[in-house]
């Protein structure tokens, strides 16, 4: 009797584990709804509708958070809006999914340069050179961005106060 109960429990466990594994998709298979939203976001971005593009891309990531391309387009939108910190985060999410994505490494490096973190950008350049076996287009573009340096930003300059004339 005891063996029958244990056997039944083991069979039930094997059945439930195997059926749950069959329902999962492989990592490289992105949900088609997410891909459709990605395309919608790209179209909106090309039309200049950055808010609509961002909404569609965020929806694509809600449907399937493994959509690396959606992170890359969101990072490009953030850079277009002058938000390099946000772009760095999106590129980091894409790199978490695929650490050797040359476009993400270059984009993150350029965003790091925009923030003034050239040392980190040089680390990305070294990773790109290692991944592509020397010089490649992404390495050349990032090296040029590093050589150019961070963009000059306008700051509010306050002229020193003139001393008040002395009263006799």
Annotate each language-model stretch with its function.
Residues 60, 93-94, 127-128:
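Canonical positions in the second alpha-helix
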Residues 63, 97, 130-134:
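Structural marker of alpha-solenoid helical repeat scaffolds
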Residues 32-63:
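Alpha-helical segment of the N-proximal tetratricopeptide repeat
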Residues 73-74, 107, 141-145:
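Canonical tetratricopeptide repeat
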Residues 45, 62, 75-79, 113:
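Position-specific recognition of the canonical hydrophobic site in helix A of tetratricopeptide repeat
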Residues 25-34, 123-168:
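Terminal, low-structured helical/coil segments at or just beyond the last alpha-helical repeat
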């Amino acid at each position: 009797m005891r063996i029958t109960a244990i056997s039944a429990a083991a069979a039930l466990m094997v059945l439930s584990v195997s059926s749950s594994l069959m329902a999962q998709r492989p990592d490289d298979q992105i949900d088609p709804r997410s891909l459709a939203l990605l395309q919608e976001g790209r179209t909106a971005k090309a039309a200049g509708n950055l808010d609509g593009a961002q909404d569609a891309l965020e929806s694509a990531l809600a449907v399937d958070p493994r959509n690396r391309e959606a992170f890359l387009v969101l990072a490009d939108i953030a850079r277009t809006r002058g938000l390099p910190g946000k772009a760095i985060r999106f590129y980091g999410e894409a790199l978490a999914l695929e650490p050797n994505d040359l476009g993400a490494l270059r984009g993150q490096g350029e965003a790091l340069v925009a923030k003034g973190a050239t040392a980190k950008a040089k680390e990305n350049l070294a990773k790109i050179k290692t991944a592509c076996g020397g010089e490649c287009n992404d390495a050349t573009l990032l090296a040029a961005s590093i050589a150019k340096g961070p963009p000059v930003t306008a700051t509010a300059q306050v002229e020193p106060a003139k001393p008040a004339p002395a009263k006799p």
